[in-house]
Amino acid sequence: ENSIIIHESIFDTLLEELKKTGGYLVTGEDRAKLKAAMWPDGRQLSGKIVCKSVKVITEEAGISVPEGTKFLMVLGEHIGPEDMFSAEKLSPVVTLWKYKDFDRAVQMVIDITGFSGYGHSCGIHSVNEEHILELATKCKVSRMMVRQPQSVGNSGDWENGMPFTMSLGCGSWGGNSTTENIHVKHFMNVTWVSYPIPADIPDADKIFAPHFAKYGK
């Protein structure tokens, strides 16, 4: 997970649970050191950090963490270039964000994906179908995992119907040709054999009736 947006009512509780599973909250001067190690020039993520362990990352940053730490956490301060922790990190470093109402949470997802790169993915841990649909329709993401871990669910699982892949399409949002998980189908050549058929021409007045009713023809 790259960022976790948490309702204020459970923020402290979830933070403690994350610590129990091996998370360590990096704050103060250590947060600044970690940021400098991850983005030495202030914008480009360092190759020394990508896909590296907590041990390698903390040594590079010159900070100490408890033995057994599995991932690092930081509190999000701003979304955008003024706080690169809102960007994609490609490492066991997760940014925690707090929200009060769901509309704000949706906007935060929109802003984070907009800064990190539209078209990739997001997730939601909820049983509220209205919230699930709202997030899916408002965010420019190609995948949305519902009550699932992102890293495992996005790339395919027997229990979620997503095709197995190591390459995630991001659609035109991300400069790709498809929003699908790239798999064997996309490497197969298909020949379309077309025969003449009776014409079935759609009625434009019916198709655009709501638009014409609202704006005129």
Predicted regions and their residues:
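ALDH superfamily catalytic-core signature
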Residues: 1-80
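Conserved C-terminal structural/oligomerization subdomain of aldehyde/semialdehyde dehydrogenase
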Residues: 63-217
